[in-house]
Amino acid sequence: MLRIAVPNKGSLSESASTMLREAGYTQRSDTKELVLLDEVNGVEFFYLRPRDIAVYVGEGTLDLGITGRDMLLDSHAEAVEVMPLGFGRSRFRFAAAAGSTLSLEQLDGLRLATSYPGLVDGYLADRGIKARLIELDGAVETAIRLGVADVIADVVETGTTLRQNGLELFGEPLLESEAVLIHRSEGTPPSGLEQFRRRLDGVLVARNYVMMDYDVERSALDAACALTPGLESPTVSPLAKPGWHAVRSMVPRKQAQNIMDHLWALGARAILVTDIAACRL
């Protein structure tokens, strides 16, 4: 029985559960549920605070977990990233009062408020910078206005909250974060990991690709296939109409409309695009 930790709340929770459902796993219907047994797939899900997930996995209490890359690195737990999951993307940035024109080198001796002391301390130590870290549990944006800190380091998605509090970003991002699948860094990988990983990878591919079908004359077939090479090769079948072929290929979702325009210009017709519900590659 595979034991997997899932965020119980926050920005990662709903997206994680949605991905797991798309991968064929049962998920809780009541947010008060803390444990759910999916007997069909042989998985037991535990809904935990996102910040605690890396600790449970690192200690070997649970086999796998879904959490943020920022929280994994901040925890210093004995856990490693298996694969990125494509949601919950954010950047970890430094910010100061608007107009302060600070640089990274000027952080020496300053008060720096953050909810991620482990992550920030490691980043600064690698660069020989010694700031006074002040750990806060959320609402870091108000620390400068309240006189608690000179600068902050926090997760930034749009930057709207920072601007509303009179702050501006400076320096390069400390980290590009997103939701990740993790397992313990020591010992043998848990049984069932590869199947679970393949299912999630199938969801990612299904989200990022579509299936494209079209008919094209033999004279334009090579050019059309160059536009739709697929993962290995497009599927090409002769039609009853002499000189015409049917083509099927996976194409990147974001490029589908542009590819359709080019195919039409080549003379392709009956161009259809359908979603991919699931796949294994």
Task: Label each region the model flagged.
Residues M1-G42, Y47, T67-V80, L85-R91, ...:
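Small-molecule-sensing regulatory modules
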Residues G42-T61:
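Short, structured active-site "lid" loops
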